[in-house]
Amino acid sequence: MIDEASPMMELKGNKSKVYWDKIDKLASVISQIGEEKTKTSPAIIGVSEIENVSVLEDLVKSVHIKKKNYGIIHYESPDKRVIDVALLYQKRYFKPIFHQSFNPNIYRNNRKVYTRDQLLVSGYLDDELIHLIVNHWPSRSGGEMKSRPLREKAAYQNTKIIEQVREKDPNAKIIVMGDFNDDPINASFKKVLKAKGKKKFIMILLLKANEFIPLINY
């Protein structure tokens, strides 16, 4: 299913063929991530740039990952580009018990910025309670400096979600994931989220993330 606002509507030719080819390639990549060491695909996957839940339903039904029995948690957001975030999870590994969508209250020049929701999902991963926040913060369109306050406000929304979780469990295990359109050295992380970590550890994470770039750069 392709929304009327989708960039795919601008394509000439067989849109359906392009769509199903992309679904097949995405599912193929997902099936390969970590498979060499774990013999399975990821237990949880945060996704962004999702047009509607039908896209996710088509994805998890792909022959590459159908047997993994992925569940879907998705909310429609008010984003002006009609794209959302969502969570995919293997039902045998992760058991969700709560989920909620939050829209950042972001304004620029006294006008509301319609951006993606932030998705909170709580559940048990191998019998251990964890909390996931899936993000897709405002882009750097118009320049990094000009758009920086938007991402800082998105980060602030993350802090409110984290506070909500920690009110019930001060020692809660929280994973913040997604497309932040920012780097660990930016103020959204260092000043707003107050993220801390050893530089060597951060570099290892970045290097490991880069290993997957050839897989998805098709």
Region spans (language model):
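A Trp-anchored, charged/polar loop motif used as the substrate-binding/catalytic surface
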Residues: 24-30, 112-122, 156-163
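Active-site His/acidic residue clusters
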Residues: 5-6, 128, 132-147
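Structured beta-strand-rich core segments of catalytic domains in phosphoester-bond hydrolases
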Residues: 50-129, 137
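Metal-dependent phosphoesterases centered on the DNase I-like endonuclease/exonuclease/phosphatase
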Residues: 150-218
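Active-site metal-binding loops of divalent metal-dependent hydrolases
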Residues: 1, 50, 137, 179-180
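Sec-exported extracytoplasmic/periplasmic mature domains
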Residues: 31-35, 55-65, 93, 160-170, ...
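Loop/turn elements at helix/coil->beta-strand transitions in domains of secreted/extracellular proteins
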Residues: 40-44, 67-70, 126-130, 169-174, ...
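N-terminal, active-site-proximal structural segment of metallo-dependent hydrolase catalytic domains
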Residues: 1-65, 69, 73-79, 83-85, ...
